[in-house]
Amino acid sequence: MKIFSPIRLVLAIAALMSVFSAPAFARVEININKGNVEPLPIAITDFMSSDGIGAQVSAVIAADLQRSGLFAPVNKNAFIEKISNPDQQPRFEDWKVINAQALVTGRVTRESDGRLRAEFRLWDTFAGQQLSGQQFFTQPENWRRVAHIIADAIYERVTGEKGYFDTRVVFVSESGPKTARKRQLSIMDQDGFNVRNLTNSNDIVLTPRFSPNRQEVTYMSFEGQQPRVYLLQLETGQREVVGNFPGMTFSPRFSPDGQKVIMSLQQDGNANIYTMDLRSRTTTRLTNTAAIDTAPSYSPDGQRVAFESDRGGRQQIYVMNADGSGQQRVSFGDGSYSTPVWSPRGDLIAFTKQSGGKFSIGVMKTDGSGERILTSGFHNEGPTWAPNGRVLMFFRQNAGAGGPQLYSIDLTGYNEQLIKTPTFASDPAWSPLLD
């Protein structure tokens, strides 16, 4: 059974650049390296179309940009000019009056072969310039993905960095009463839409993680009452056990090149970090202690590994070279630290911290300095990075009879967003950008 298939898109970059194209000194930009920034007022018009699809596309674009915390879509009721032809230069004064510093116009049309063509233009209203213009062709059922791609293009043009909207998240969906909760592996778009289940059994599943090429997921399952790490092919639905070891295997994660899986393997009462070469199926032991070493995460260059260990009496974060040498502790604050995950940018490690009766999500530099707590509460856990390294997703369990939910937060700690899902949700893992 085909669970997931890649969506083919034809992209014509700069196909819509016109005589209004902007020079390099156009003023609309956001410097996201300055910490907390003021969101950019941006007017996003309903894309022209013969049906309601154009307005739906622009609504998704607006939601993506607003959720980033870097853009503030202007209320449509304030619009003065009604865009009747997105190919024509807008009346910039009408947009400056309502302080829309950027303007997005576009259209969605249906081709004779049934495909959709979505096109957009991004304008700097104060400089009176077009900043970007692109068009995309795809099947009608993929219209939401086209909207995410357009949002990424706008984000990149204004901030100078890659966006993260055309991505997916694999997670554990949870349903049923607390005493008999069913946990399934599921996948969705990063905004919580297009949820699909990847497994359908009563066996507990935990810690799903994407491969670098986005085509595989590794996860832990208690199938047959035996905790093991599995590898699932998203396109075919085929899966296999990653190593038939006598003890528990858990906390799997791919190496950046996709050639290995790093995981924790329990043998003789101890849990240590191992790697398995997916081609030769040979394993290499990286740690050898009488403690519990788990939750390994590679640096983006594959040269180092962060992991958690209780070898010092309580859970702390350690860093080592990829061959297991040079192991050193990097967390020294109050409380215990767990679930370390290296930023795609290589500059930070995100973590879960338990201290003072609260579970917090935070980040630190890779040497342990500069620790910052982004959010705290009854139970926050399991951070995962957006592919641009600017946003984290995690799950939160509030006190009471409810269940866990997914949230996102940026590195300022101010832009926390609930990711709505049909069921309770935990253990998120963000994909790289899609092709």
Swiss-Prot record:
Alphabetically list the UniProt keywords.
Cell cycle, Cell division, Periplasm, Signal
What gene is this protein translated from? tolB
Instruction: Tell me the disulfide pairings in this chain.
Output: none
Record text on subunit structure and interactions: The Tol-Pal system is composed of five core proteins: the inner membrane proteins TolA, TolQ and TolR, the periplasmic protein TolB and the outer membrane protein Pal. They form a network linking the inner and outer membranes and the peptidoglycan layer.
Q: Which domain of life is it from?
A: Bacteria
Per the entry, what this protein does is: Part of the Tol-Pal system, which plays a role in outer membrane invagination during cell division and is important for maintaining outer membrane integrity.
Give me the Gene Ontology terms describing cellular component.
Answer: periplasmic space
Instruction: Please name the GO terms of the biological process aspect recorded for this protein, alphabetically.
Output: cell division; protein import
Q: Which organism is it from?
A: Agrobacterium fabrum (strain C58 / ATCC 33970)
By sequence similarity, the record places it as follows: Belongs to the TolB family.
* UniProt signal peptide: 1-26
Q: Name one Pfam family in it.
A: TolB_N
Q: What is this protein called?
A: Tol-Pal system protein TolB
Compartments, record wording: Periplasm
Q: Which InterPro entries match?
A: 6-blade_b-propeller_TolB-like, PD40, Tol-Pal_TolB, TolB_N
